Regions:
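Cytoplasmic helix-loop-helix junction between adjacent transmembrane helices
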Residues: 1-24
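Intracellular juxtamembrane helix-capping segments at the cytosolic ends
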Residues: 1-8, 197-210
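Helix-loop-helix hairpin linking two adjacent transmembrane segments in secondary transporters
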Residues: 20-63
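C-terminal membrane-cytosol helix-exit motif in multi-pass small-molecule transporters
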Residues: 53-71, 260-268
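Juxtamembrane intracellular "pre-TM" segments in multi-pass secondary transporters
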Residues: 66-98
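Short amphipathic helix-loop junctions that connect adjacent transmembrane helices
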Residues: 111-127
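Helix-to-loop junctions at the C-terminal end of transmembrane segments
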Residues: 142-155
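Structural signature of the two symmetry-related core transmembrane helices
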Residues: 158-172
Length: 338
């Protein structure tokens, strides 16, 4: 995520983060779809060999990534100061809890689900990929419109809470109808739809909410939360599997999702700000110039990098009026296209 932030323009970063989120979600589902089939062909040792080869391919693909020619460094704050700033922001913490809970539930489910498909749906392990793949396609069919609505019509908070509710609904179906093959598949389908929506929304929301100067720090905390969630999800899934009580297992996961929903109600609607990078004009008093810039209607955040001669600005385009544009032109010494 940090590398992606380095090689994308500030104004394109939200789109890039949403695309990365969907890629992560797809990778999980495709892996779980192909895993049983590959294991039946090459065994566990062969599966690890395939994983190693794919890791090497991923390293080779990094050669195609554009070289970073401009490094964004913040000399005004140390790393610990940035970390302190990030962990004190309530909405960012709720997003960290969200990615933790999402990946905990996903990992726990995919330790728990195979035994359910074998016992109640009577689907052999080698055929589980044929279950997951259609569910993936169906979930994407519903997930893409939800993401478009969230971004285009500024309904992110509503779609976000609806997706968590969808996860809960899928788990409730599994609690009360896991013995039915069709209810089991329906519950998994609803979970997949909600999961893919959440996986795309979380990085996008994080990019919107994190301060410019601490964005990489926020991404690091979020990524750590994600993998911690996967770790605890694997541990929890194994414990639930040993209970040999399906209803209790699904109930525990549903309880976690309900707690997550209650925490997420505290999220405020993200501000839909545009991030732009502008060349820094020749000014003697940078602090005074920054203060004047922040006083302009529609300018919400400014980070100046004197060594790079650029200014990173978050702008509320809907609040900009003709007077604001004239003030921007005066401060930058030329017309600013926003």
């Amino acid at each position: 995520m940090a590398l992606l932030a380095d090689v994308t323009r500030e104004e394109q970063r939200t789109k890039a983060m949403a695309a990365m989120g969907m890629s992560i979600g797809l990778s999980f589902v495709v892996a779980f779809s192909l895993g049983p089939w590959l294991t039946s062909l090459v065994g566990i040792s062969g599966l690890f060999f395939v994983t190693t080869i794919m890791g090497l391919i991923a390293i080779a693909m990094l050669l195609l990534v554009p070289k970073v020619t401009r490094h964004h460094r913040n000399y005004q704050q140390g790393y610990m100061a940035q970390l302190k700033q990030v962990i004190q922001m309530g909405d960012l913490n709720r997003l960290h809890v969200s990615v933790f809970a999402l990946h905990l539930l996903l990992t726990a489910m995919f330790i728990y689900v195979p035994s359910q498909l074998i016992e109640f749906a009577h689907i052999p392990l080698a055929s589980h990929g044929l279950v997951y793949l259609p569910l993936l396609v169906i979930s994407l069919f519903f997930a893409f419109p939800s993401i478009i609505i969230a971004e285009k019509y500024r309904k992110m908070r509503g779609i976000f809470l609806t997706a968590i509710t969808g996860i809960i609904a899928g788990l409730l179906l599994l609690i009360f109808g896991y013995q039915s093959k069709y209810v089991l598949l329906a519950g998994l389908g609803i979970f997949f739809i909600a999961f893919n929506v959440m996986e795309a929304l979380l990085p996008s929301w994080l990019s919107k909410s994190a301060p410019i100067q601490s964005k990489a720090t926020a991404m690091g905390v979020n990524a750590s939360s994600q993998f911690l969630g996967a770790f605890f999800g694997g541990t929890l899934g194994g414990q639930l599997l040993m209970l040999h009580n399906t209803a209790i297992g699904w109930s525990v996961l549903a309880g976690i999702a309900i707690i997550w929903l209650l925490i997420s109600f505290g999220l405020a609607q993200p501000r839909y700000l545009s991030s732009i990078v502008l060349p820094l004009p020749q000014v003697q008093q940078v602090n005074e110039w920054t203060t004047q810039l922040l006083a302009i209607r529609g300018i919400e955040e400014v980070v100046v990098m004197p060594d790079q001669q650029v200014a990173y600005i978050k702008v509320d385009k809907q609040s900009l009026d003709d007077a604001s544009r004239r003030d921007l032109t005066q401060l930058f010494g030329k017309e600013v296209a926003i």
